[in-house]
């Protein structure tokens, strides 16, 4: 009997795929994460693999590359099944070794089309396939050593400060002075714990501030990277504390669609682009590539989810004794993207609309009744159609998402380079009108450089 490994973390999708495949005579082996899936493939040598892109513990791009690095598995067909409509993701998956790319929801006819002539499982040829390992030569720290609970005496303030609020590229000048022109960087503190969300150009000013505050003292902090697009890492070479030998920096993030976290930061500091290499930074810089979707940083419990953005991009939910802050910097709401895509193609698909709606509901559940939501709001309704599939959200959808999730305070974030202070003010005014029409309660403002939000711990 032909066997197939299905690597999918969504239980509903996994069950539907299993039902369809078994009806067609397949022996189905299931995995909820990439690491388990890789082991199943090595142990069972299936005829085919169905793999989502957005899975924990080795994303789908990694799975494709690792399987294709195994000569003994050359006959195994790899089919990516994903909710991502982004053209770059399709191209990257095929370059990583996928044989086909199916956008969810995957129907039985889709499976029949891509699996018509797959032979029975490859016969052993005397070689033993070994478990794949990452080809990026980085020694990773064991991230399982994080604490898993708050301290009993949880009397800690949570402070959020914005140092960079712009998307895509820096936009300095007199027309952006009130909002700010630096790219993504948010300082997050809980007690003595310092977490920096992304390393856009705003991190330079934050570094100068920290250097003054900690003059004569060692500085220990964590930089949490959402993804490695330029506007989220371009400020790191200018982060002053990284050049002090007494400071320790932990840089956390997930492997991207094309390589490791350290590699991405290293390459932008190569000689062709920057005069100082990463190895010349005197600070103790430790890279930790995350695999699990839940982890702990001191007293801060962190949960992550894949956002709808080209490549691998994560949103973070940070829970402290003072409350919950969600950082979703780059995200395109699924339903509007799907509706407009279908409208342009002239091909209505009710199943795809329902799938998009369900994906948006999953994101809303992840956000939950957060105290603060920092969320992508790059376009207005007129701009969005010409930027369909760029991985950013229409502000109206951001407000709707916050209302559905029961958020207390929404900070519009990742402002478009073409949006000056006046434009952003008008978007805030429109957002408040939407809240009023909904009849619900939600505080809305634009994230602005220098702005500070304080959440005080509730004593029990």
What are these regions (language model features)?
Residues 123-341, 421-460:
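Binuclear metal-dependent hydrolase catalytic cores
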Residues 335-442:
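Cap/insert and terminal regions of metallo-dependent hydrolase folds
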Residues 8:
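Conserved acidic carboxylate
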Residues 56, 74, 86, 104, ...:
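The feature encodes the CheY-like receiver
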Residues 15-23:
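Charged docking surfaces used in two-component/phosphorelay signaling
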């Amino acid at each position: 009997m032909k066997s197939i490994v299905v690597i999918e973390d969504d239980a509903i999708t996994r069950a539907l795929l299993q039902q369809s495949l078994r009806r067609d005579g397949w022996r189905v082996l299931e995995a909820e994460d990439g690491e388990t899936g890789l082991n199943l493939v090595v142990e069972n040598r299936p005829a085919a693999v169905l793999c989502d892109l957005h899975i924990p513990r080795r994303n789908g791009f990694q799975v494709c590359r690792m399987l294709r690095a195994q000569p003994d598995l050359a006959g195994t067909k790899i089919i990516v099944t994903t909710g991502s409509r982004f053209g770059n993701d399709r191209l990257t998956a095929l370059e990583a070794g996928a044989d086909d790319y199916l956008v969810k929801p995957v129907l039985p006819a889709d499976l029949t089309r891509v699996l018509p002539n797959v032979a029975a499982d490859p016969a052993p040829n005397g070689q033993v396939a070994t478990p794949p390992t990452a080809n990026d030569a980085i020694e990773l720290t064991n991230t399982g050593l994080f604490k898993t609970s708050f301290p009993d005496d949880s009397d800690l303030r949570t402070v959020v400060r914005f140092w960079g609020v712009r998307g895509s590229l820096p936009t300095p000048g007199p027309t952006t002075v009130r909002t700010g022109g630096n790219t993504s960087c948010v300082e997050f503190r809980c007690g003595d714990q310092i977490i920096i969300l992304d390393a856009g150009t705003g991190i330079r000013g934050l570094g100068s501030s920290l250097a003054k505050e900690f003059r004569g003292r060692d500085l220990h902090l964590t930089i949490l990277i959402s993804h490695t697009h330029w506007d989220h890492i371009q400020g790191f070479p200018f982060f002053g504390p990284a050049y002090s030998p007494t400071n320790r920096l932990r840089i956390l993030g997930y492997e991207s669609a094309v390589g490791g976290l350290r590699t991405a930061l290293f390459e932008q500091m190569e000689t062709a682009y920057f005069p100082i290499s990463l190895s010349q930074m005197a600070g103790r810089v430790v890279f930790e590539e995350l695999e699990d979707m839940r982890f702990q940083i001191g007293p801060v419990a962190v949960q992550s989810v894949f956002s709808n953005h080209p490549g691998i991009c994560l949103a973070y939910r940070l829970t402290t004794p003072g409350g919950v802050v969600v950082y979703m910097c780059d995200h395109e709401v699924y339903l509007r993207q799907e509706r407009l895509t279908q409208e342009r193609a002239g091909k209505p698909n009710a199943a795809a609309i329902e799938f998009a709606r369900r994906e948006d509901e999953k994101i809303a559940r992840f956000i939950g009744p957060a105290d603060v939501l920092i969320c992508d709001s790059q376009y207005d309704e007129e701009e969005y159609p010409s930027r369909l599939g760029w991985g950013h959200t229409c502000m109206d959808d951001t407000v709707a998402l916050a209302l559905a999730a029961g958020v207390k305070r929404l900070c519009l974030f990742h402002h478009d380079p073409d949006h000056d202070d006046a434009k952003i003010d008008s978007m805030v005014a429109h957002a408040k009108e939407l809240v009023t029409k909904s009849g619900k309660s939600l505080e809305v403002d634009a994230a602005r450089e220098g702005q500070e939000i304080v959440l005080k711990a509730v004593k029990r």
